[in-house]
Amino acid sequence: MEYKRPFGVKIDLETGVIPGAKRIVRKLSDMRGYFVDEEAYEKLLREDPVVYEVYAIEQEEREGDLNFATTVLYPGKVGKEFFFTKGHYHAKADRAEIYYALKGKGGMLLQTPEGEAEWIPMEPGTVVYVPPYWAHRTVNTGGEPFVFLAIYPADAGHDYGSIKEKGFSKIVIDEGGEVKIVDNPRWSV
């Protein structure tokens, strides 16, 4: 039998960068339809800021293997809504995931397909377990980049379409300097 070789990489804990990793950049223009305040979105779109970057170490999509990635989620807002990742279910919905906060301040918004939502605040050292069947999105509620590590099954896949179509049942906003979790006026089952 030929065994896969073990390896190690170093994560820059200050920047979140994994040297040599696959880099994905998500700009505001990649997130049309995700934010509630369309007028604020169009105004900020003129600058088209980078919302987040992902540095992924991916394996072959097969059962039993693991992928891992860091995400650098930048501070910012569209209207009152904090910058967030697109969010997704897993294509193989029965797959779980682990997130570990490295730097900054934010949280994880999770929901079931029926719209039951949970908010888990995150700061450096926080570990979040994402159970199977739960959609998940990270949100930067602070003033500096929010950096975290994600570890997930290599065959989990990503279902972004369900979130793009229906959104999350809750949104995370800045209400007078406080983080508030409120109903998404555009959400539908």
Swiss-Prot record:
Keyword Metal-binding attached: yes
Protein's recorded name: Glucose-6-phosphate isomerase
InterPro entries: G6P_isomerase_archaea/bacteria, G6P_isomerase_prok, GPI/OXD, RmlC-like_jellyroll, RmlC_Cupin_sf
Catalytic activity: alpha-D-glucose 6-phosphate = beta-D-fructose 6-phosphate
GO function term, MF aspect, one: glucose-6-phosphate isomerase activity
Biological-process GO terms, alphabetical: gluconeogenesis; glycolytic process
Species, as recorded: Thermococcus gammatolerans (strain DSM 15229 / JCM 11827 / EJ3)
Enzyme Commission no: 5.3.1.9
Record-linked Pfam families: GPI
Record: residues binding Fe cation: H88, H90, E97, H136
Oligomeric form and interacting partners: Homodimer.
Record bears the keyword Isomerase: yes
Gene name of the encoded protein: pgiA
Pathway: Carbohydrate degradation; glycolysis; D-glyceraldehyde 3-phosphate and glycerone phosphate from D-glucose: step 2/4
Principal cellular location given in the protein's record: cytoplasm
